[in-house]
Structures are given as structure tokens and as C-alpha cells.
Design a protein with these regions (language model features):
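N-terminal lobe of the biotin/lipoate ligase/transferase fold
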Residues: 1-156, 209-210
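Long, positively charged amphipathic alpha-helical accessory segments at protein N-termini or as interdomain linkers
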Residues: 2-8, 111-159, 164-233
């Protein structure tokens, strides 16, 4: 199976949402055509924007509309799963528009592959990403040894958020990996609805900048390998 990988640079959220929808509809129209084309993977950087999933809670937005406008950020209530998150400069946003039927997988397995690809991406930087039971995305934590020798996991912080939509086995929306994201934007929300967990980035964990271009290229390789896809030339 083949996939088209597109780097579209910096694009406003609404414009990219419409672009996703166009690709989504085109892929739906081609279902059952017998081709080896499995879809498109978009890599994009958005200007500052908050998005709330279809079942999200507006109370997780901690600032009002006036403050939002003063900061120069946008807000959209959208049709993906998950709660509230932020997209902005230095963040690798990835939207796989894929036909899961052609890939022979279901939605749960699809999300597992997204998570695994992120875990492998941050591992390239020596970062131990992991899953958190009851939550999607990829997380980091610190393992602390107590005086009695017991080891506990503390300081859970999210490095990648995942929120997707699927209809008739075709996906849209996707993931947001914090490469060099300004994390102050997350202080204005309860990220993904959590009030007891933090947010981090590759840059913060390493103490050196890892930019969008570098991290997105690593992620692309991991996605292609884990979905067993070849990139269309």
C-alpha cells in the first residue's frame, strides 16, 4: 500500500480542516476501487488555536473570549474525539487521512499504531514515552523510589495528544506532538480535560531545541514503518 505524505507548512486551522475534509471525501469516493492508494498524511504547523472535541467540556477552557482574542489565538469546536487541546508554533500536527479497510485494521488498532509511532519517535531522542491507562496519547513520568524501596510513577506529563474521527473506515484529525511548543499556552486550559497532569515537549525534556522539520521527518518514518506503507513519490 502507498500513501502521499504532504508537508504544508504553516496553515490556519480552519483552512487545514477544510483541506482534510476534501481529502477525506475524495478517499471515501474511491473506496472499493482496488487501488494501492491508502490515503494522505498531512504534516502541518498551526498558528495559535484551541480546539475542543465533540464530547469535550467547555469548562476546560480557562479564559474567556476577550482574553483569547487579546492573545491572538483562535478557538474551534470540532468533530474529533477527545477534549480540549492547543496547537501552535513548534508543534508537529499530523493528520492521517487513511482507509483503514485497505490497511486491514480497526480504529482501536489504528490509535495504538499512532501511539507506538510517537513512542518510537521520542525514543530517537532518548525519551521514554509511554501509554497511560484510561487515556489516549503519549506520556512521560518520573519513577521515584520511596524509602521502603517501593517504586512509584509521578509527574505524569503529556508530550503528544491524539484525537481522531473515523467514518466508513476513513480517518481524519490525528495527533499533536510537542517538539518546541511554547508550553505557556497550555496553562489556559485543562489539557485533554486533565487537572492533575502536566504537558511537556521534546525541547523541554532535552534542554535543546528540536524543531518541527526535524521531528516531523522522524515521525513520518515511524508512521510509514508501523502502518506498513510506502511513500508515494
Amino acid at each position: 500500500m502507498h500513501v502521499d505524505c504532504k508537508w504544508v507548512g504553516r496553515m490556519p486551522y480552519k483552512e487545514c480542516w477544510e483541506y482534510q475534509q476534501t481529502l477525506f471525501n475524495e478517499l471515501l469516493a474511491k473506496q472499493g476501487d482496488g487501488s494501492e492508494h491508502a490515503g494522505t498524511i498531512i504534516f502541518v504547523e498551526h498558528p495559535a488555536v484551541y480546539t475542543l472535541g465533540k464530547s469535550g467540556n467547555m469548562s476546560n477552557m480557562l479564559i474567556d473570549e476577550a482574553r483569547l482574542k487579546a492573545l491572538g489565538a483562535e478557538f474551534y469546536h470540532i468533530d474529533r474525539g477527545g477534549d480540549i487541546t492547543f496547537h501552535g508554533e513548534g508543534q508537529v500536527v499530523c493528520y492521517p487521512i487513511l482507509d483503514l479497510e485497505k490497511l486491514g485494521i480497526g480504529l482501536r488498532r489504528y490509535i495504538e499504531i499512532l501511539e507506538q509511532s510517537i513512542i518510537e519517535t521520542v525514543a530517537e531522542y532518548g525519551i521514554n514515552g509511554r501509554r497511560l491507562e484510561g487515556a489516549t496519547g503519549v506520556w512521560l513520568c518520573d519513577e521515584v523510589e520511596l524509602p521502603n524501596g517501593e517504586k512509584v510513577e509521578r509527574n505524569w506529563r503529556k508530550i503528544c495528544a491524539i484525537g481522531v474521527k473515523a467514518s466508513r473506515f476513513v480517518t481524519m484529525h490525528g495527533l499533536a506532538l510537542n517538539a518546541a511548543t511554547d508550553l505557556k499556552w497550555f496553562t489556559m486550559i485543562n489539557p485533554c480535560g486533565f487537572i492533575d497532569k502536566g504537558v511537556t515537549s521534546i525541547t523541554k525534556e532535552l534542554g535543546r531545541e528540536v524543531n518541527f522539520d526535524e521531528a516531523s521527518r522522524v515521525l513520518c518514518k515511524k508512521l510509514l514503518a508501523n502502518f506498513k506503507l510506502e511513500r508515494e513519490q
